């Protein structure tokens, strides 16, 4: 019986490895196709030879100029921000044990949006510092949620979710109030609130890339801790985990990732919610 169980377990593990490998290969292929379509399709269609010339650096034509200054930054920003929001959503779902959790439930997106809209309306000259302001707003939302959830030892996933939803609604209401009272700034503010990757510059890419790399490193490093945490606080504490510290570290990481993403692309919440579920469906639930 033991031998049969071991063989069955080994077969399941081999099947999981094959599925993960196949998923990775298909994902990479789809990524390359998406990158090509993003660079080639637009108001001016760019041929494959022009894209290849840009990659190899052999020519300096109008097409390569368009790729380098417009489409490549936009494409990279989409990849980085999508990855950042997906990781933020995964981390939120892990620490709250709520399958519907995303940076929005932590009050992060709403806090970042509120600060940016407020500064855009009152002090437009500070618009160049939107990324820093968004991070400050995200920390404001996250810290408020953390404070309302109770003391460090009394924080529970339910308290965190309820406090996050309350703060999200509060900041969203404040943002809408600012828009209503300042009609002159409506066009600029509404364009940003809708979300867009238009006009992304290389400087912004260079600024946000380290945050994604840090998030990937920390997520991989804490993967086992997050898996243990999903078993429940009592079991995690019984295994020697300091659940409060883990949640605090993950919460700070979520705040930074969401704040940076919101400052560049606007308050996008769906990516952080749906991507973790897609990946769990394909490769399993182990963090």
Model-predicted segments: where are they?
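Alpha-helical transmembrane segments in inner-membrane proteins
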Residues: 1-287
């Amino acid at each position: 019986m033991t031998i049969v169980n071991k063989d069955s377990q080994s077969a399941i593990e081999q099947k999981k490895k094959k599925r993960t490998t196949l998923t990775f290969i298909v994902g990479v292929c789809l990524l390359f196709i998406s990158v090509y379509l993003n660079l080639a399709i637009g108001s001016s269609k760019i041929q494959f030879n022009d894209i290849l010339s840009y990659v190899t650096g052999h020519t300096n034509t109008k097409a390569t100029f368009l790729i380098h200054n417009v489409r490549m930054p936009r494409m990279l920003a989409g990849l980085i921000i999508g990855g950042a929001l997906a990781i933020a959503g995964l981390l939120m779902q892990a620490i709250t044990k709520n399958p519907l959790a995303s940076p929005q439930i932590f009050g992060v997106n709403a806090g970042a949006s509120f600060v940016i809209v407020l500064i855009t309306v009152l002090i437009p000259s500070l618009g160049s510092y939107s990324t820093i302001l968004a991070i400050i707003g995200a920390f404001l939302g996250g810290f408020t949620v953390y404070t309302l959830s109770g003391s460090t030892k009394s924080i529970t996933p339910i308290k965190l979710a309820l406090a996050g939803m309350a703060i999200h609604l509060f900041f969203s209401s404040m943002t809408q109030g600012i828009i209503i009272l300042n009609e002159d700034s409506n066009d600029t503010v509404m364009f940003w609130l809708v979300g867009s990757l238009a006009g992304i510059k290389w400087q912004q890419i260079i600024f946000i890339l380290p945050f994604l790399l840090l998030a990937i490193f920390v997520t991989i490093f804490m993967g086992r801790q997050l898996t243990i945490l999903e078993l429940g606080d009592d079991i995690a504490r019984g295994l020697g985990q300091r659940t409060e510290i883990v949640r605090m570290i993950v919460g700070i990481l979520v705040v930074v990732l969401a704040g940076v993403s919101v400052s560049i692309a606007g308050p996008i919440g769906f990516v952080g919610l749906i991507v973790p579920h897609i990946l769990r469906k394909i490769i399993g639930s182990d963090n």
